[in-house]
Amino acid sequence: MSRKYFGTDGIRGRVGEYPITPDFMLKLGWAAGMAFRKQGHCRVLVGKDTRISGYMFESALEAGLSAAGADVMLLGPMPTPAIAYLTRTFHAEAGIVISASHNPHDDNGIKFFSGQGTKLPDEVELMIEELLDQPMTVIESGKLGKVSRINDAAGRYIEFCKSSVPSSTSFEGLKLVVDCAHGATYKVAPSVFRELGADVTVLHAQPDGLNINEGCGSTHIESLQAAVLVGHADLGIAFDGDGDRVLMVDHTGAIVDGDELLFIIARDLQEHGKLQGGVVGTLMSNLGLELALKDLDIPFVRAKVGDRYVMAELLEREWLVGGENSGHVVCCNHTTTGDAIIAALQVLMALKRRGETLAQARQALRKCPQVLINVRFGASKVDPLEHPAVKEASAKVTDALAGRGRVLLRKSGTEPLVRVMVEGEDESQVRAHAEALAKLVSEVCV
């Protein structure tokens, strides 16, 4: 069954444009509350990132949930994975996150977690969509949901993050620069690393509701690179606005992406006999990751793009580690979703156990040149991925790469974009192919 509202990562869009409006959020809160309380009374946790519209949508969701008879526990600004963790530990029926992740402040969105802290099952999302098309009713006054605030939410999550590192491990002597993107990690991330002994310089941890992800964080890593070099830090850590993505910068200023972080974590687990199976990447994972894992006899499979699909593949195979090159890294031995702080801690622990710098650790993975071009397709009625000319050109590029590279064309699940990716051994050839395909996609979208 097709979805009317939910994309690959919940509901997302521009604030003030349907469905990212207060009236829709009121109805969404009610529909979610009705779906969650099918089995009787229920409790729902609600958290958000730091964008200004989060306060407005928090109030609307709270009212809708209460009207459906669901109790609401407000977390305030918290990383998305923290909301998943707290939903599980509070034995709530569901968790709701108000966030547009790495997008600018004038976007916002909603995503849900099940009571187990995982992405909501498809059937529950479809049930919510069905209820959204029904008239809203209010439960009798004596059964209205109550609202409370969890005042120690940040402290609970900080202790959880620290518990993912053995008590015998200290990061004393490690000099870090941490970029919080003026987002949801701004309070908890610096505390976690400092309490584990690291010397931490913090960037972009003064959210004002409008500056989330603005020229900072994992999508704008230049200022972190500069700070690492100027401060002679051992490495830098960049989070996105809601704290489910992480990228790093080594002491030379080089960017270390999700594929490389995933490799470092998987290798460390294998060396300590804790890997359990293999590694899940995505269609966008660099071919170099697959080859480096193969050298270690670590199985590797590709899921569709999106951390929910990585998680689904991990659960089906009962494996522990997966992720995306964008910086979503899932460590199922600790979390039920991508958690940027947890992933960063696992990398730091791996470096300490091997006695390596980040620059040294990443050398074992030789990335193949990969060019990604985003093409905006607007309101065009033409599906560029099904256009005969695009299909023919894609097939020709695949033939030209002669089994030593890949071509991937896909639509973004969160934005009106077609992502054109070409990967191979020769960077100039790869770039030429990618630019030609992107130009063709742009032309057929007009």
Swiss-Prot record:
One Pfam family here: PGM_PMM_I
UniProt keyword annotations, A-Z: Isomerase, Magnesium, Metal-binding, Phosphoprotein
InterPro entries in UniProt: A-D-PHexomutase_a/b/a-I, A-D-PHexomutase_a/b/a-I/II/III, A-D-PHexomutase_a/b/a-II, A-D-PHexomutase_a/b/a-III, A-D-PHexomutase_C, A-D-PHexomutase_C_sf, A-D-PHexomutase_CS, Alpha-D-phosphohexomutase_SF
Domain of life, per UniProt, equals: Bacteria
Q: Nuclease among the record's keywords?
A: no
Active site, UniProt feature = S101
Reactions catalysed, as given in the entry: alpha-D-glucosamine 1-phosphate = D-glucosamine 6-phosphate
Protein name per UniProt = Phosphoglucosamine mutase
Q: Which organism is it from?
A: Pseudomonas putida (strain ATCC 700007 / DSM 6899 / JCM 31910 / BCRC 17059 / LMG 24140 / F1)
